[in-house]
Regions:
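Active-site catalytic microenvironments in core metabolic enzymes, especially phosphate/sugar-handling
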Residues: 1-99
């Protein structure tokens, strides 16, 4: 069974890190790199609907084109990850679901 770190390395072979913008937060952002993965959900953006779908399907990993924690887009919101704010609420759900 592949682990998150192996999937990340395979993705970097297809899309090398150095092709990303310097402000783009690429790579594994949350959870254990050693987690085994049976199911992956691929999405353009990590939204509440995407997280719900990943939970419903029993996914251990979401691979998205746009990073959930993008410093350029979410700089102010990342300073406090509160569950009453959008980004904090999504991250809390992902951590609880071990995705």
């Amino acid at each position: 069974m592949p682990i998150v770190a192996q999937i990340e390395q395979a993705l970097f072979q297809l899309a090398p890190k150095d092709l990303a913008f310097d402000w783009d937060n690429v790579g594994h952002l949350e959870g254990s790199p050693d987690q085994e993965v049976q199911r992956v959900l691929v999405a353009l953006d990590v939204t509440e609907n995407v997280v719900s779908e990943a939970e419903k399907l029993g996914c251990q990993l979401i691979v998205s084109h746009h990073p959930l924690m993008n410093v350029r887009w979410h700089q102010a919101e990342m300073q406090t990850l509160r569950p009453n704010r959008y980004l904090g609420r999504l991250l809390r759900r992902l951590v609880k679901a071990d995705i």
